[in-house]
Structures are given as C-alpha cells and as structure tokens.
Amino acid sequence: MKHSKKIAALIILLLMCAVLINPERYLSSVKDGVILFWAAVLPALFPFFFFTRMLTGLGFPETIGKFFEKPIKFLFHTPPISAYIFFMSVLSGYPIGAKLISEFYKNGVINTEESKKIIAFSSTSAPLFVIGTLGVFMLDNVSYGVIILFSHYLSAIITGLVFCNVRRLNATKSDVKPRVKPLPDNVIGDSINDSVLSVLSVGGLIAIFSLVIDVLYDLKFFDLFGNYSPLAVGFFEMTRGAKEIIKNPPSTGALLAALTGFTSFGGLCIFLQATTFLKEAKVRSSYYFLVKVFQGLVGAGIAYLVSLPLP
C-alpha cells in the first residue's frame, strides 16, 4: 500500500471511530448534510442536470457551438461545443461543467486533452448562489454579490486563457466535426435516470463532508489556524467557510477576496463532486486541483482590486 493510501485509510478509520464513540452527534451531522442536500441542493441542481441532458440529445450544443465557434477557438483553442459547456456551467453552477465534459467524452465528441482545457474555464458557481445566497442572504448587500460574481467569472476566463494556451501544443487536430449521439426513444425516462444517479452522488458527498467538518471542529483542528480558521473551513466547504468569515468580517476588500476565493476554488466537497465525473474523461485530480487553486487565487485578487474604492 502506498504511503498516501495508508494516510487515507488511517483518516477513514479515525472517522469511523468518531462515529462509533459518539453516534448521536455524528449521525446528526450526516442528517444535517442530507437535509441540506434535500432542501437546497436537490431542487436547484436536479432540474439543470435533467434539462442539460435533454438539450444535449436535442442537438442544442451544436447550435450554440456553431454560433460561438470563432471566438471560442481564438480564445481557448477548444472545439465549438465547449461554448455550450461554458454557458451551462455559468447558468447552472457546480458541477454541471464537469458532468457535461464527462458526457461528451463518453460520446466521443471530445478527447482527454480537450477535456482538460475545457474544464479550466467551465467550472463555475451559479448566479443564483452568488447573488442570492452570498449577496442577499449572507451579506445583505447585492452589490457585494455582483462584485463576487464578476470576479469569479473573470477568474474562470483568465484561468482558461492561461491553461488552454499552455496546453495548446498538445491539442489534437481533426477535420471531422463530431456529433452528439442522439438520445434513445425514451428520452425523458433516460434523462431522469441519469440525472437522479448523478445528483445522488453529489448528495452523498455533501452528507459525508458534513460529518467530516463536524469531526474536525470537535477535534479543534481549525483552531490550529488561529485567525485564518475560516479560510481552512472554506477549503473544505465553501458555504460554511463563508458563514465563518462573515461572523467576524475583516476589511471589505479582504472579505470579498476571501468569499470570491471560496467560490472560485469551490471547496474540497465540490472538488470531489467534479472529479467523480472528470475521471471518466481521464482528467487527473491533481491537474484539476491546480486549475481550481489558480482560479481561486486569481478570483480573490480581482475581487480585492475591484473593492479598493469601497469603504
């Protein structure tokens, strides 16, 4: 067994022991994660999983791809269909971009190299979360939500420009324009089945991370980071990290930078959600992690600069 696998096995055993020692506490943590998934994530995510699956089968990605073919090739050197993946990611949020990449890879529309480039700019949060949850609900300031959203999407584009051009020499060229495979006769039924399985995998990770974070809190793990503990929490789960930093907010610039960093990186929970799909396109987790760290840092920097004129 490799050293990293031994560490992972040890962590899993410790988590199991924690549940056995205090089952009431940690089963409640899992329950909280399930409730969060059921009440907030499932209603927001399932329709988009379903509709994107339907649009794919109806040939809509090709229509969008043809319309944006020249700018998408000029900026990112990726196939036209990546425009559809980008717009769906912007509209629907995590982890739609990764899921669509997985689907198109399995259909033979894109290859692994193209998947790596597309995920660099197609891994984003949804406006509903940024403006609604962060801006209105948590910060009680829509303009702050707009700054975070602008910085977040700009960081995705910059990340795409950097990583796509770095990988440009590895791009594969083909004169054949692949087509999306049509869905079978039972379009609605198959779309629902696929969407249910995908969204349940997301729900499972949310429930597990609710448990993990509560265990880490009880072990005083986050106290090791002192004043930077909200950043450590946000590394694991962006929403809880946002709640922690808003409790004792720093300067406006630092606050918006941190929240944009959380949103752009996505947290380890969302990272693992995306990798469950990206592994089917043979995109390595280490590469995707580098992409998200870069995007998080760029997003934080942009938000800080934009917020400098603010009091």
Tell me what each language-model feature is.
Residues 11-18, 289-307:
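Final/C-terminal transmembrane alpha-helix of multipass membrane proteins
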Residues 188, 192-263:
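Transmembrane helical segments that form the transport core of multi-pass membrane transport proteins
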Residues 7-26, 49-59, 164-166, 210-222, ...:
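Structural signal for alpha-helical transmembrane segments and their membrane-water exit/capping regions
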Residues 8-12, 33-57, 187-215:
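Core transmembrane alpha-helical segments of multi-pass membrane transporters/permeases
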Residues 1, 168-193:
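Intrinsically disordered, low-complexity non-transmembrane regions of multi-pass membrane transporters
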Residues 104, 109-165, 277-301:
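Membrane-core helix-loop-helix motifs of multi-pass transport proteins
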Residues 75-139, 232-249, 255-278:
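Alpha-helical membrane segments and immediately flanking helix-loop junctions
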Residues 39, 44, 48, 52, ...:
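Alpha-helical transmembrane segments in multi-pass membrane proteins
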